[in-house]
């Protein structure tokens, strides 16, 4: 009888705190992939990782650039090492730094040190090809990264006869704050009775055209005929604000930045300015009720190397 292969996944505190987030979704999808290919998995946060790394593992997976300080320790305790930065360290850190988040300068230097001094890494994955290409400087002499997009996006879409404009996100996050300012400007080009529904923690009502719902579980977030708005201007990765509604067959309007990594789709509209956003909203509203929602699923991504990752996982005993 073959001995069970054991894997340890190390994620950020946000990814392991039990709340739904992009980081938690990423960790969950990698955990599912490991279990589906025959691994018994354990999960640790950065804070608890060292106690888990007192044992030996067949595979250790580190998710996020902020776990890079554990690469050397993980290498000593595992047969194989998988590093999933997820999105581009350069795009994410620099965009926050340019937003006057000064502490990002220190985090940037810290992560850079651990990246350049890291040991051999057997598999590197990113969430999109764009993110991978932005980090070519440090992985160029290592293994060629694979692209592992977002899974686990199935959501219940409840029936509704009426369209809603929807923005979801944490209001404490700077890119979301900028997006809300963008939408406040967008609302000036819309009919005065047309509201934008805001879903998420920490969102303040800054416009008479906004309706704030606070945090909602994903069972109550998605309705047929919703139009999801994602005016993101900075950062890396695939935007969940785009991925989740698009995966589930809903209309999305986003910027060139927010739509990066996704295929062209009749349900994904691109706009760069508040006026353009309002024009795209009006165009979708003129089309009327979209009827039964068709779910395109993996067809939304430009590239998804899950089959190659599965093959790699099955290649060692």
What are these regions (language model features)?
Residues 14-33, 145-208, 212-223:
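Conserved catalytic-core segment of nucleotide-activated headgroup transferases in glycan assembly
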Residues 22, 275, 286-317:
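A charged, aromatic-enriched C-terminal amphipathic alpha-helix characteristic of glycosyltransferases
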Residues 52-69, 82, 123:
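Short N-terminal targeting/anchoring amphipathic segment
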Residues 75-94:
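Active-site proximal beta-strand in glycosyltransferases
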Residues 89-91, 102-124:
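Membrane-proximal helix-turn-helix segments that form the acceptor-binding/catalytic region
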Residues 115, 119-155:
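Donor nucleotide-sugar binding/catalytic pocket of nucleotide-sugar-dependent glycosyltransferases
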Residues 223-237, 248-250:
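Acidic donor-binding loop of glycosyltransferase active sites
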Residues 241-244, 251-255:
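Short hydrophobic beta-strand element within catalytic cores of glycosyltransferases
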């Amino acid at each position: 009888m073959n001995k069970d292969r054991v894997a340890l996944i190390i994620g950020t505190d946000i990814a392991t705190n039990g709340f739904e987030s992009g980081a938690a979704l990423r960790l969950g999808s990698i955990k599912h992939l490991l279990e589906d290919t025959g691994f018994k998995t354990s999960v640790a946060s950065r804070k608890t990782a060292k106690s888990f790394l007192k044992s030996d593992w067949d595979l250790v997976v580190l998710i996020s650039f902020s776990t890079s300080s554990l690469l050397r320790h993980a290498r000593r305790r595992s047969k194989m090492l998988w590093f999933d930065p997820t999105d581009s360290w350069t795009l994410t850190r620099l965009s926050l730094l340019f937003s006057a988040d000064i502490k990002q300068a220190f985090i940037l230097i810290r992560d850079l040190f651990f990246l350049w001094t890291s040991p051999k890494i057997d598999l590197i994955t990113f969430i999109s090809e764009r993110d991978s290409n932005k980090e070519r400087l440090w992985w160029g002499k290592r293994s060629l990264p694979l692209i592992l997009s977002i899974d686990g996006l199935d959501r219940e879409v409840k029936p509704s006869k009426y369209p809603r404009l929807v923005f979801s996100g944490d209001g404490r996050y700077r890119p979301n704050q900028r997006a809300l300012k963008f939408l406040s400007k967008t609302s000036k080009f819309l009919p005065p009775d047309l509201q934008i529904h805001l879903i998420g923690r920490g969102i303040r009502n800054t416009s008479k055209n906004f309706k704030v719902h606070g945090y909602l579980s994903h069972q109550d977030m998605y309705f047929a005929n919703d139009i999801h708005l994602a005016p993101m201007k900075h950062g890396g990765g695939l935007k969940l604000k785009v991925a989740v509604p698009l995966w589930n067959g809903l209309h999305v309007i986003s910027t060139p930045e927010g739509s990066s990594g996704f295929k062209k789709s009749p349900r994904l509209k691109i706009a760069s300015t508040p006026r353009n956003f309002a024009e795209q909203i009006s165009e979708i509203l003129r089309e009327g009720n979209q009827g039964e929602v068709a779910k395109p699923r993996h067809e939304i991504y430009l590239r998804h190397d899950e089959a190659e990752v599965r093959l790699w996982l099955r290649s060692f005993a």
